[in-house]
Structure formats: structure tokens, C-alpha cells
């Protein structure tokens, strides 16, 4: 929430960075737009009064999710990668890279039966374990972006990436 991009994005719905983060209107009763849970506990949405909308945070509320459906966000991300590669870094660790894209319809994740609530990297009593995460991560668009990232990395011989992911079908 301290990044300049987010500060600009939250100020209005029509500024140049308005669509750089995942924003959504409240449901008619004022609650978050869907049932998505944060991996670190609680709902994955936080109300932003300046903008009058919720923003998505799959992790901490201080880590709002970039809107990778926006081509400008993808380009800016690749520009940042290029900056560091030009500086001579040997590679990048891609933390939770499968969380870049979300379902554009913001559909509710289906509930998971109690017997299936197994934590992979989180406690099984964390509400995050109570859902199948079909819509808040691991979307098909993610692979297209990773292909673009790989194409950039291939221009730097010897540079490597290490991606960290987890998903329902990861094992």
C-alpha cells in the first residue's frame, strides 16, 4: 500500500493507474465482492474508502495484488525484470507466481469438505483451507505471461528463474 502505483490507483477510478490493481465493488450489502480468503488469514479483500471499492490481497493487506490482466502491468513488470537483468543479476525468484491472475468474473471459490481440508504450507484450521482455490489463482493466463517472461530471460544467457507455486493440484 506504500508503493506509488498503489497510491495513485486508490485515489480514483479513472486515473492512469486506476486499473493497475484488482479493484471490485462491494456486494449490495456492503460485503466483499466474493468469498476469497487470504492465505495469511481472513478475507482477501480490504475496503479502500478513498476509492469506494475493495482491493484484492491474496496475502497481507499491505500487499495489494497487481492486476496482471492489464497489459500495462505486464509490460511494467517485464521492464523491471529487464532493469535487474541489465544490472547483471544471475536470476530471479518468482514468489507465488501462480497468483498473478485471477478469475475476471470474481466467482466464489467452492467450499471444500472438512475431510479434504489439508494445509499445504498453511495450517488446516486456516479458513484458506476451507475452499477449493479455482478462481483466485492458477489461471490459464498465467502461462502466457510466464512464456513472455521466459522469452525475456532467454535474452540473458546464464540467467535463471526459480518459481514458487502451490495449488490444489500441485502434488
State what each model feature region is:
Residues 92-94:
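Hydrophobic residues within beta-strands of alpha/beta enzymes
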Amino acid at each position: 500500500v506504500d508503493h506509488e502505483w498503489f497510491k495513485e490507483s486508490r485515489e480514483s477510478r479513472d486515473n492512469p493507474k486506476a486499473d493497475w490493481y484488482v479493484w471490485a465493488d462491494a456486494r449490495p450489502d456492503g460485503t466483499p465482492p466474493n468469498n476469497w480468503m487470504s492465505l495469511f488469514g481472513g478475507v482477501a479483500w480490504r475496503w479502500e474508502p478513498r476509492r469506494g471499492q475493495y482491493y484484492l490481497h491474496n496475502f497481507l493487506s499491505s500487499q495489494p495484488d497487481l492486476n496482471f490482466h492489464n497489459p500495462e502491468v505486464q509490460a511494467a513488470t517485464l521492464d523491471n525484470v529487464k532493469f535487474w537483468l541489465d544490472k547483471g543479476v544471475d536470476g530471479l525468484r518468482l514468489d507465488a507466481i501462480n497468483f498473478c491472475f485471477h478469475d475476471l468474473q470474481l466467482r466464489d471459490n467452492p467450499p471444500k469438505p472438512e475431510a479434504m481440508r489439508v494445509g499445504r504450507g498453511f495450517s488446516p484450521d486456516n479458513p484458506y483451507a476451507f475452499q477449493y482455490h479455482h478462481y483466485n489463482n492458477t489461471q490459464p493466463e498465467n502461462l502466457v505471461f510466464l512464456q513472455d517472461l521466459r522469452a525475456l530471460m532467454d535474452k540473458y544467457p546464464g540467467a535463471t528463474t526459480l518459481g514458487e507455486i502451490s495449488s490444489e493440484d500441485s502434488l
